[in-house]
Amino acid sequence: NVNSKVSENNSSSDVVFKVNNQKTMFSIAVSFKYGSKENTKLFLFDLSLNQKIEKDFSFEKNTVINKNIELHENLEVIYLTQKIYSTELKNKESGGEYFYEIKQVSSTDVKTKKINVENHYLPSLSFFCLKDKLYGLGFYSDNADFKYSGIAFFELDSHSLEIKNSKYSSFTQQFILDKYGEYKDKEIKNIVIKNLY
């Protein structure tokens, strides 16, 4: 992940490079802000550097955060996970005022699937592809203090994006005590989900 910032015109850019598990395709995602718009440009190439996909997306500033990109083992598609802030969710009594959306981008079209966070706070959600399934993982909180309460899990069909399974699994009280501790300086600083495949 390469970041660069240009302060004179209030613009910035991010470049992300991703290779599929079979090492037969790679993707480049370029995100940049300029003025009131945020833009994302996606490319997919095979190993002979033949361009398979080029797609552009544009959003109002501060409404969308790109979380991750993922590639299929065999299909020529890019999966883009985004966190989307919605004005319709401003009056929610509890939980985050946003939802997640996963886009399946091919050379001919874009499919989308909306993932609601319900009454939880889900600061981050990342998807990875294994065979014909997409798996999403993220830590969630039940309170606005963002102390993690458990792990959110989603299983989607990688072709249709149909949600096959979803679950919010809460941590045990002992784990929460170990994580946050009785005393501030005794808490566990970070929890990391390692590569699972």
Where are these regions (language model features)?
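Peripheral, non-catalytic segments that deliver or gate enzyme domains
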Residues: 133-134, 141-144, 152-158, 179-197
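Short beta-strand elements that form the blades of beta-propeller/WD-repeat-like
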Residues: 16-18, 22-35, 43, 69-70, ...
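A short, structured loop/turn motif at beta-sheet edges
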Residues: 72-76, 106, 130, 159-160
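Beta-propeller blade signature
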Residues: 39-50, 93-109, 148-162
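Repeated scaffold domains used in trafficking and secretory/extracellular systems
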Residues: 8-17, 61-71, 119-128
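Beta-propeller domains
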Residues: 29-57
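Surface-exposed loop and turn segments in beta-propeller and other repeat-based domains
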Residues: 1-8, 57-61, 113-119, 160-193
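Asp-box/WD-like beta-propeller blade repeats and closely related beta-sheet repeat scaffolds
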Residues: 1-8, 98, 108-135, 139-144, ...
